[in-house]
């Protein structure tokens, strides 16, 4: 397997519960290295742009509202098969369907407030990383 990068968000619900450290511990325990990270409070414009592919869907307005409701942590993770591994750690989008021990099974409140976001493919990972980070903000750790 090749070393790859993925994009991740610790969403406002998890940040407000002080779960950043616990979530980062899960990433690192699974062999994923945090190579860029920052806390920010997304503006409506940032959230709308990030989730533009969902515009017009019934959940879009609620998603933008939720993602702007408080601070988030955005990060780039690097490791072997990082996209798949990160998605396994997160669990199913709906926490009721998430396997026991996954982040969403442990920390999500609902399908709408599901603690974390992760890229689903190499193309989306590249796009999402570039949305929040410039190349000089990414620090490979070897």
Curated annotation (Swiss-Prot):
The UniProt function text for this chain reads: Major role in the synthesis of nucleoside triphosphates other than ATP. The ATP gamma phosphate is transferred to the NDP beta phosphate via a ping-pong mechanism, using a phosphorylated active-site intermediate.
Which residues take part in binding ATP? Answer: 11, 59, 87, 93, 104, 114
Q: Which cofactor does it need?
A: Mg(2+)
Localization annotation: Cytoplasm
Instruction: Please state the protein's primary subcellular location.
Output: cytoplasm
This protein's species is Aeromonas salmonicida (strain A449)
Query: What's the name of the protein?
Result: Nucleoside diphosphate kinase
Q: Name the Enzyme Commission number(s) assigned to this protein.
A: 2.7.4.6
**What PANTHER family does the entry give?**
NUCLEOSIDE DIPHOSPHATE KINASE, NUCLEOSIDE DIPHOSPHATE KINASE DDB_G0292928-RELATED
Q: Which GO terms describe its cellular component?
A: cytoplasm
Under the subunit heading, UniProt states: Homotetramer.
The reply on keyword Membrane is: no
Q: What SUPFAM superfamilies does its record include?
A: Nucleoside diphosphate kinase, NDK
> Which branch of life, at top level?
Bacteria
Give the family, as the similarity comment puts it: Belongs to the NDK family.
Q: Does the keyword Iron apply?
A: no
């Amino acid at each position: 397997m090749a070393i790859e990068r993925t994009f991740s968000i610790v969403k406002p619900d998890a940040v407000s519960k002080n779960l950043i450290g616990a979530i980062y511990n899960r990433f690192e325990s699974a062999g994923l290295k945090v190579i860029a990270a920052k806390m920010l409070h997304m503006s409506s414009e940032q959230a709308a742009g990030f989730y533009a592919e969902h515009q017009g869907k019934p959940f879009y307005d609620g998603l933008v509202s939720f993602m702007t409701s408080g601070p988030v942590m955005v990060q780039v993770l690097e490791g072997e098969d990082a996209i798949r591994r990160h998605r396994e750690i997160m669990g199913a989008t709906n926490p009721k369907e998430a396997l026991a021990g996954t982040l969403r099974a442990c920390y999500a409140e609902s399908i709408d407030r599901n603690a974390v976001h992760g890229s689903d493919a190499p193309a989306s990972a590249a796009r999402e990383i570039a949305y929040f980070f410039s190349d000089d903000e990414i620090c490979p750790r070897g």
